[in-house]
UniProtKB/Swiss-Prot annotation:
Component of the 19S regulatory particle (RP/PA700) base subcomplex of the 26S proteasome. The 26S proteasome is composed of a core protease (CP), known as the 20S proteasome, capped at one or both ends by the 19S regulatory particle (RP/PA700). The RP/PA700 complex is composed of at least 17 different subunits in two subcomplexes, the base and the lid, which form the portions proximal and distal to the 20S proteolytic core, respectively. This is 26S proteasome non-ATPase regulatory subunit 1 homolog A. PC repeats lie at residues 412-447, 452-485, 487-521, 522-555, 557-590, 591-626, 627-659, 661-695, 696-736, 739-771. The gene is RPN2A. Ubiquitous with highest expression in flowers. InterPro entries: 26S_Psome_Rpn2, ARM-like, ARM-type_fold, Proteasome/cyclosome_rpt, PSMD1_RPN2_N, RPN2_C. GO terms for molecular function: enzyme regulator activity. The keyword Ubl conjugation applies. The modification Phosphoserine is found at S896.
Length: 1004
């Protein structure tokens, strides 16, 4: 008999008023099954059903059934709070495993409610009553996820609900614990907003990692770095270094390189100093050797060099185990101090330099001599274009032109050498010697070039200043000239970045208190650089002085300095940010925008974004509005795709300052990504009606397009041509021209071998890079700060290293067309008149003579029966002849079609074999593959950066790469040739420091 169709719930609802409990139970059971269909009708009787739930004489099961029914009715009515409240009353009848919209919606609501209560309890430090029934539902849900094998879902809920016990359970029970832990680290960086809670999660992960039979030490050390626990890292490194297994030592060296990539100088030095020295007898030997080498010690040499020599003597004096440890310790200390990676980067950038001097020549010729802004911009562009390559050919060839720089332009020109020679730690002092203050204050040279030289020393030793700090302090103390103080303050801030050195702080503070506008501005920035991320009490001292002084320059320097002190502190900086953003002085509010940007840098924190957007549209000062928009770039660089979307409306603002801020925000957060949306947003701004907006858009576009080839995005070629047009246009305004010149430098930065990277591969902020871009963005007020962009440059290189930290030759594959990632063609920027002069008249007699000579040469070659390999040389020679006289007589044209036919059918290969060390741009990383029969295997799979290699055929002799180095004896002419062709100048071991180029001075 078929079940009759129910057309109304009226009868069942009437039964609810019956006195007998069995009838009520029957009605509730059936209504529960029909509620999806008849909830509008049932909703009229909700008070009756509620009274049944509240009736304590009623059976528990029946009360729970009533609660479930009411919950479903409220769900359909859209009253989710009431629905959840009754669902909790339904107890086990609310089945978390049921696959229905009702259950999914209420579970989400329950988890949100529970998570917000747990967060509130922790953040307010107060007891918050949490309904045990709510907790029970969440726990049932977590248990179900774990039992169903949905570990990632369980971990997400556990992290959100601050249930670290359940998080640990989910990780341990998962089938791939290592993978689950990696996922968890990513989640904690991406989704955990509060810093303290993120630390709790990472501490738990370290605990779980350490319980594993074979811990992933690379990940553990990254977590410990986030937690700022140098002792933990030092213990792991010591354990690996003392291991008898060579692979463990390689792993320790790889960990050290990975930590160095995050650029946290104070942490790295702390780890280095905690690594225990070898046994006592070895230490005594060390001291003896140190006393003998002391007289020969180079005053500019880094402190670490003193540790390296004695380590070699220890090897012979201790037992083999300790000797091995001592040798490995020397290597790892060199890495942690940053020397090894800086040295290798310097050699890579020198040997692979592909900068195009023709571009600079074009800029120089098109810039009017009277225009000092464009003259300086050309010097900046040259420094950026050759950052870290040690190639100063352009300056040597144009000394007369360079000598036209006066006053602050001379300061900038000298400081530019610091960018070109960045990382030349051992020869930094000797390179800058001709310009440095001689014999105390006012040694006879120009104070501008002396100040610039001190700033240059800071740029050379940025974030690695152990060997130069004392010299800079002495220079600062021994002068009262504000220009020299300006350079010395910036140099000290750079070299002691983030070390919070009290003595240096006091020296800089005494300069600040002289109340000199020029020196005070640099002192304010320097204090910030020194105290980066310390969130120190000294910030309030700086703020108090900013209120006292009358100089805008000093207030601006201090405002930025205060912002730097709260770098990465997130909600810990909220009080200071509140204080600054409410200040009456617009310059301090401007500093407040930077404080917001840096405190929440790379977090994509909604609260910070909301505040910045609010100031961007509501502040009365254009400076503050511009900076508020620009600051979005810093908050969002970990999620660059978001930035163009968030600032797209602001980029169309009526206010040019807001448009400029939007351009630079995109430039900062999307730097080096070549993101299509970013380029589309910037394109209209490069032809804006306001000159400074065009300038900002051109610079931002270059930042986005750095290391992007024309083959991967045709707009890169269009942009290069646009820059050339602006530079060559006599009627273009100075602001745009300056933007175009700087953009040309950024586009080809570091000899076309560096990109701008704000995150390391382990998703840690690169402190130096973020700080560099923050100070660089101040160039609006002070052009010499442009050089800070060099701190954000990161080499696009794969540098494989063996156990001895040498660079062996080994091949690997880039599984993509070579044209996608090749260097730009060197002829991209022809000189203005070349195209017109190319067609030249050629006499027919000379054509015939050449043809005759060619024929004779070929016959002679056949007669001598030359060997096979020489034939292509002759062919290529004849090809050259054809190319150079392309439009000559008939006899030459006979060869042409054949040559064209030969070349035409060659298809481009689908892959490319690269040789270590190789240029690998970020977009190329996903195509990097190792060859199957390779002699070397990386300790960790990494497509770029410094990678330690395990040698599978140790008995075979090794061939080493990266032996090109600058020579000190090369004349300017040979230097030019070597730079243009990238030919090796002299062979040297990888451990040797490249020689400094010839010293030169330009007349004032």
């Amino acid at each position: 008999m078929a079940t009759p169709m129910v057309s109304s719930a009226g009868g069942l609802l009437a039964m609810l008023n019956e006195p007998h409990p069995v009838l009520k139970l029957h009605a509730l059971s059936n209504l529960n099954n029909l509620v999806d269909q008849f909830w509008p009708e049932i909703s009229t009787s909700v008070p009756i059903i509620e009274s049944l739930y509240e009736d304590e004489e009623f059976d528990l099961h029946q009360r729970q059934l009533a609660a479930l029914l009411v919950s479903k009715v409220f769900y359909y009515l859209g009253e989710l709070n009431d629905s959840l409240s009754y669902a909790l009353g339904a107890g086990p009848l609310f089945d978390v495993s049921e696959d229905s919209d009702y259950v999914h919606t209420l579970l989400a609501k329950a988890i949100d409610e529970y998570a917000s209560l747990r967060s509130k309890a922790v953040e307010s430090n107060e007891m918050v009553d949490i309904d045990p029934r709510l907790e029970a539902i969440v726990e049932r849900m977590l248990g179900k996820c774990i039992s169903d094998g949905k570990y990632q879902q369980a971990m997400g809920i556990a992290i959100e609900c601050r249930r670290l016990d359940k998080l640990e359970e989910a990780i341990i029970k998962s089938d791939n614990v290592q993978g689950t832990l990696s996922y968890c680290i990513n989640v904690s960086h991406s989704f955990v907003n509060r810093r303290e809670y993120r630390h709790e999660v990472l501490s738990l992960l370290v605990k779980v990692y350490q319980k594993l039979p074979s811990p992933d030490y690379l990940s553990i050390c990254q977590c410990l770095m986030f937690l700022d626990e140098p002792q933990g890292v030092a213990s792991i490194l010591e354990k690996l270094l003392r291991s008898e297994n060579k692979d463990d030592a390689l792993l320790a060296l790889q960990i050290a390189f990975d930590l160095v990539e995050n650029e946290h100088q104070a942490f790295l030095l702390s780890v280095r100093d905690r690594l225990p020295a070898p046994k006592t007898r070895a230490v005594e030997a060390t001291q003896a050797v140190e006393t003998t080498i002391a007289p020969n010690e180079n005053p500019s040499g880094d402190v670490q060099m003193a540790d390296e020599t004695p380590a070699q003597t220890i090897v012979h004096e201790t037992d083999p185990v300790d000797a091995t440890y001592a040798e490995r310790l020397t290597k790892i200390k060199g890495i942690l101090s940053g020397e090894t990676s800086i040295q290798l980067t310097l050699q890579f950038l020198y040997s692979h330099n592909k900068s195009d001097l023709l571009i600079l020549k074009t800029i120089k010729q098109s810039v009017e001599m009277r225009n000092s802004v464009c003259h300086s911009a050309t010097i900046y562009a040259n420094a950026i274009m050759h950052a870290g390559t040690t190639v100063d050919t352009f300056l040597r060839e144009n000394l007369d032109w360079l000598s036209r720089a006066t006053n602050w332009a001379k300061f900038s020109a000298t400081a530019g050498l610091g960018v070109i020679h960045r990382g030349h730690l051992q020869q930094g002092r000797s390179l800058m010697a001709p310009y440095l203050p001689q014999g105390g204050a006012g040694g006879g040279g120009s104070p501008y070039s002396e100040g610039g030289a001190l700033y240059a020393l800071g740029l050379i030793h940025a974030n690695h200043g152990e060997g130069i700090k004392q010299f800079l302090r002495d220079s600062l103390r021994s002068t009262n000239v504000e220009v020299i103080q300006h350079g010395a303050c910036l140099g000290l801030g750079l070299s002691a970045l983030g070390t919070a050195d009290e003595e240096i702080y006091d020296d800089v503070k005494s300069v600040l208190y002289t109340d000199s506008a020029v020196a005070g501005e640099a002192a304010g920035i320097s204090m910030g650089l020194l105290l980066v991320g310390t969130a120190t009490e000294k910030a309030s001292e700086m703020l108090a002085y900013a209120h006292e002084t009358q100089h805008e320059k000093i207030i601006r320097g201090l405002a930025l300095g205060i912002a730097l002190t709260v770098y990465g502190r997130e909600e810990g900086a909220d009080t200071l940010i509140e204080q600054m953003t409410r200040d009456q002085d617009p310059i301090i509010r401007y500093g407040g925008m930077y404080a917001l940007a840096l405190a929440y840098s790379g977090t994509a924190n909604n609260k910070a974004i909301r505040q910045l957007l609010h100031f961007a549209v509501s502040d009365v000062s254009d400076d503050v509005r511009r900076t508020a928009v620009l600051a979005l770039g810093f908050v969002l660089y970990s999620d660059p795709e978001q930035t163009p979307r968030i600032v797209s409306l602001l980029s169309e603002s009526y206010n040019p300052h807001v448009r400029y801020g939007a351009a630079l925000a995109v430039g900062i957060s999307c730097a080096g990504t070549g993101l299509s949306e970013a380029i589309s947003l910037l394109e209209p701004l490069t032809s804006d009606v306001v000159d400074f907006v065009r300038q900002g858009a051109l610079i931002a576009m270059a930042m986005v397009m750095v290391q992007i080839s024309e083959a991967s995005d045709s707009r890169v070629g269009v942009f290069r041509r646009q820059l050339e047009k602006i530079i060559l246009d006599k009627h273009e305004d100075t602001m745009s021209k300056m933007g175009a010149i700087l953009a040309s430098g950024i586009l080809d930065a570091g000899g076309r071998n560096v990109t701008i990277r704000l995150l390391s591969k382990t998703k840690h902020d690169k402190v130096t890079a973020v700080i560099g871009l923050a100070v660089f963005s101040q160039f609006w007020y002070w052009y010499p700060l442009i050089y800070f962009i060099s701190l954000a440059f990161s080499p696009t290189a794969f540098i494989g290293l063996n156990y001895d930290l040498k660079v062996p030759k080994f091949e690997f594959m880039s599984h993509a067309k070579p044209s996608l990632f090749e260097y730009p063609k060197p002829t991209t920027v022809p000189t203005a008149n070349t195209a017109v002069k190319l067609p030249t008249a050629v006499l027919s007699t000379s054509v015939k003579a050449k043809a005759r000579a060619k024929k004779e040469a070929e016959q002679k070659a056949i007669a001598e029966k030359t060997s096979g390999p020489e034939k292509p040389v002759n062919e290529s020679g004849s090809g050259k002849g054809k190319a150079s006289t392309e439009k000559e007589g008939d006899s030459m044209q006979v060869d042409s079609p054949a040559a064209v036919e030969k070349k035409a059918p060659e298809p481009e290969p689908a892959f490319e074999i690269l040789v270590n060390p190789a240029r690998v741009v970020p977009a190329q990383e996903k195509y990097i593959k190792l060859l199957d029969d390779s002699r070397y295997v990386p300790v960790k799979l990494a497509p770029s950066g410094f990678v330690l290699l395990k040698d599978l055929r140790e008995h075979e002799p090794e061939v080493l790469s990266l032996t090109d180095a600058p020579t000190s004896t090369a004349s300017p002419a040979t230097g030019t040739a070597a730079a243009a062709q990238g030919t090796p100048a002299s062979a040297m071991a990888v451990d040797d420091e490249p020689q400094p180029p010839q010293a030169f001075e330009y007349a004032s």
